[in-house]
Swiss-Prot record:
This is ADP-ribosylation factor 5. GTP-binding protein involved in protein trafficking; may modulate vesicle budding and uncoating within the Golgi apparatus. (Microbial infection) Functions as an allosteric activator of the cholera toxin catalytic subunit, an ADP-ribosyltransferase. It is found in: Golgi apparatus; Cytoplasm, Perinuclear region; Membrane; Golgi apparatus, trans-Golgi network membrane. NCBIfam families: small_GTP (TIGR00231). GO terms for cellular component: cytoplasm; extracellular exosome; Golgi apparatus; perinuclear region of cytoplasm; plasma membrane. GO terms for biological process: intracellular protein transport; retrograde vesicle-mediated transport, Golgi to endoplasmic reticulum; vesicle-mediated transport. InterPro entries: Arf1-5-like (IPR045872), P-loop_NTPase (IPR027417), Small_GTP-bd (IPR005225), Small_GTPase_ARF (IPR024156), Small_GTPase_ARF/SAR (IPR006689). GTP binds at residues 24-31, 67-71, 126-129. GO terms for molecular function: GTP binding; GTPase activity. Interacts (when activated) with GGA1, GGA2 and GGA3; the interaction is required for proper subcellular location of GGA1, GGA2 and GGA3. Binds ASAP2. Interacts with NCS1/FREQ at the Golgi complex. Interacts with RAB11FIP3 and RAB11FIP4. It is a lipid-anchor. The keyword Nucleotide-binding applies. The lineage of its organism: Eukaryota, Metazoa, Chordata, Craniata, Vertebrata. SMART domains: ARF (SM00177), RAB (SM00175), SAR (SM00178).
Length: 180
């Protein structure tokens, strides 16, 4: 009985807990995004060899965000973070046209993973402040997202250094996850 009352109170008054995995190729801006959300400021980053994990509270939701390094040698380790992931944030450098196919390939590999079958997908089309950045429509096409039939997904234009679009993406993510 006590557990039931406790669960009821946490549903009414408590923060909802969500496990989010944030991945993408190296230098896409994952760590910058994480700490912009957590601290509200830009921090100096170095390539992530392993992971950063932080809790980000936003609109009565407690996001546990796992930022996993994106260098090609450590991408096989991504699968160790898949379990219990409710939301997948895939960060793409919109300005890096030479590597967009590599991003698409990595994303498609992840979406085939059984442990991620129920995770909603939020793509952050990052670095939109750059003059050659691909717009959302072009990036959506190059990532092949329009072919995803059995998954909820959304692409949000972002600029991590300015914070533009980050909270819009979290709004979408929290809305989708709250429906589950």
């Amino acid at each position: 009985m006590g557990l039931t009352v406790s669960a009821l109170f946490s549903r009414i008054f408590g923060k909802k807990q969500m496990r989010i995995l944030m991945v993408g190729l190296d230098a896409a801006g994952k760590t910058t995004i994480l700490y912009k959300l957590k601290l509200g400021e830009i921090v100096t980053t170095i390539p992530t060899i392993g992971f950063n994990v932080e809790t980000v509270e936003y609109k009565n939701i407690c996001f546990t965000v796992w930022d996993v390094g994106g260098q090609d040698k450590i991408r096989p380790l991504w699968r160790h973070y898949f379990q219990n992931t409710q939301g997948l944030i895939f960060v793409v450098d919109s300005n890096d046209r030479e590597r967009v196919q590599e991003s698409a390939d990595e994303l498609q590999k992840m979406l085939q993973e059984d442990e991620l079958r129920d995770a909603v997908l939020l793509v952050f089309a990052n670095k939109q402040d750059m003059p050659n950045a691909m717009p959302v429509s072009e990036l959506t096409d190059k990532l092949g997202l329009q072919h995803l039939r059995s998954r909820t997904w959304y692409v949000q234009a972002t600029c991590a250094t300015q914070g533009t679009g980050l909270y819009d993406g979290l709004d979408w993510l929290s809305h989708e996850l709250s429906k589950r």
